[in-house]
Amino acid sequence: MSTVSVKVVTRIRPQNKIESSRGGKPCVTVQRDGTEVFLSTDDEGEYRFTFDRVFGPTSKQKDVFEYIGRPVIDSIFKGYNGTIFAYGQTSSGKTHTMSGPDGSIGEPEHRGVIPRCIAYIFEKFGEADEHIEFTVQTSFMEIYLERVKDLLNIEKSNLPIR
């Protein structure tokens, strides 16, 4: 298990087709060491942000999984709880990172963190002693405008936060 309880990672998603077709220009630069991001603005200059790790727009889904997904699953199999939390504004790349780009469900190379974690969990089941029994619980929630929605049960919306 890592000696750090929480890691903060950012992923700069690639421009989508609409952004590219409209002549959009990247405003974020990733520092070579992979821990800093520079955000340039036309009117206010440049801002610098530091993270445990930064994945740029050319990063591979596999690399993101290897850094954040695999260690969490390994820790879970050692008895710890694990959470991977995606946060960001609308269209910032949460779904791209967690699930994969639109239309990529059948393309293993483009699978996001969630399908890779699920595959890895079942791989770990296969490696375990046959007498060990596993129980898996998962939840997928969206918090938007301070409303919580269960993404696995569309009838459960505006859930209380405890």
Feature roles, as predicted:
Residues 1-162:
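Microtubule-binding structural modules
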